[in-house]
Amino acid sequence: MTCGTRSSFSLVHWLEAPVLGISSLPLPPSLSSDTSAHPPLSLSLLILEISSARPFLFRHIIDTPTLPASPLPPPPTPLHSCKNCKRFSPIILYSLPPVLLMAATFVPAHTAFFGAKKEIGARSSFSPSISAHRCRKHALNKVLAVMAPTQPSRAPATTGSVKHGMTMTEKILAKSSDRSKLEPGENIWVNIDVLMTHDVCGPGTIGIFKKEFGKNAKVWDREKIVIIPDHYIFTSDERANRNVDIIRDFALEQNIKYFYDIKDLSNFKVNPDYKGVCHVALAQEGHCRPGEVLLGTDSHTCNAGAFGQFATGIGNTDAGFVMGTGKLLLKVPPTMRFVLDGEMPHYLLAKDLILQIIGEITVAGATYKSMEFVGSTVESLNMEERMTLCNMVVEAGGKNGVVPPDETTFKYLEGKTSLNYEPVYSDESAKFISEYRFDVSKLEPVVAKPHSPDNRALARECKDVKIDRVYIGSCTGGKTEDFMAAAKVFLASGKKVKVPTFLVPATQKVWMDLYSLPVPGSGGKTCSQIFEEAGCDTPASPSCGACLGGPRDTYARMNEPMVCVSTTNRNFPGRMGHKEGQIYLASPYTAAASALTGYVTDPREFL
């Protein structure tokens, strides 16, 4: 049996085989160079594999033996004599039935995708054209390489060799891994610039860190860890409050420089260190910088990609490892390119654009891929609108989203950070797995109907949907510009809302902006004044609020079946509370217009 054998055996079936065991995994340079400088560790690695036939997540936690303080033992005998597989000999497999092991031998190893360019206008729909080419290499090579990446030997360039460019994401990861060249699918040890965690995942991350590195271990860099309580804050729930206590104790113990604490829950304004929603606070406090790698224990960490950096969410196990080493094993994602051109209509916002995109490619369309946003429309967006674009790439399955940094980016960062940063941009010869083009001038306001962000519909097509409430807030739709947009609709209508309208600023700064910044064209009125005249609820304490449900006493939580138009990012059953609640995701324009009528409403009725 050779590695060149073809078979139709499904990779998905193979991935459903029992857990794989590993012996002798390679370590990050900082650990492997001098094992005597570190105590023995027990690592847990997350293995991700994507099926070529369809988006498919293969995730196993594999515990390795304690790392020896002496040189690693010699590699075991290779599984077979295939020359293509010998380089992975440090790995052995067990607990794999012989039948599956034999079947796996037939599995194609690599897949190259070719996505046709798409021209997209109003109301267009399509299924991305993807064709798969199956390689002849041994299937085990692919999986083994994911588990134990090796540095391939590179021969000197020969006459006539072609230098291929890299995408933004590839360049950032190359720089952070001290590599001159990277390609999608490679597994690399990345040096992390910023690690963020919050009150929901922080306690778990801290627990794993202490278990694996020792109760008295110190974090790798106290100035590169940001801890932000924001999710379950203004509640009497004891478990939620205990989580905040845990991250506070850890921050004090480790002398974490950037811990944005809140102690008095009765009045957030007396807590000068408290910020609010982590993703918006990271930007406002200068932790988002072009060309860097930012990881967070929250899926919407991709929000920071608006600054031209690699930002993605990770689990507690990975975060615990990063806390102790400052490194993480990452697989380089391929990049999808989204070109948005045309003048932005006055009735559209970035939320309409990202809902349009997700509706086109589906919630699985960008699975473990980078989404790069370019074009004249993107260049015209302010930083908060760019953050909205990148925030929801994870709703399409994306690994990360990026916007090329420009003068708008640099101006936003002035006064927010004193650290130097190095912007990077995609090469002209960079390879993209697919490209989608949108003529933004032809698009209309859209919503995502229950119960999925890709269940897209034109807002005007949902005019008969009666609603019970409107919610304006979250990391996606609770920024200053989002409230300015809502106030613009209320001001233009001169009417009062017909359903309860809840306002939850993302951060303290946003809250203060609502009471201090005049709304353009209002004659000096602030958002808070316009909201009061329209009959909205008083702006609440800044936090994640009801975006993710939370304890029963969370402000604006849906504790009974209701229909809600929301500027948040997810609408699966139970997301904002009651499992029978229905959530229509929309832009602040559409949310405000709907509040005025009591039905899902196209904002062009008022703008």
Label the predicted regions.
Residues 2-4, 63, 84-607:
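Fe-S-dependent hydro-lyases/dehydratases of central metabolism
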Residues 8-99:
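Low-complexity proline/serine/threonine-rich segments in eukaryotic and viral proteins
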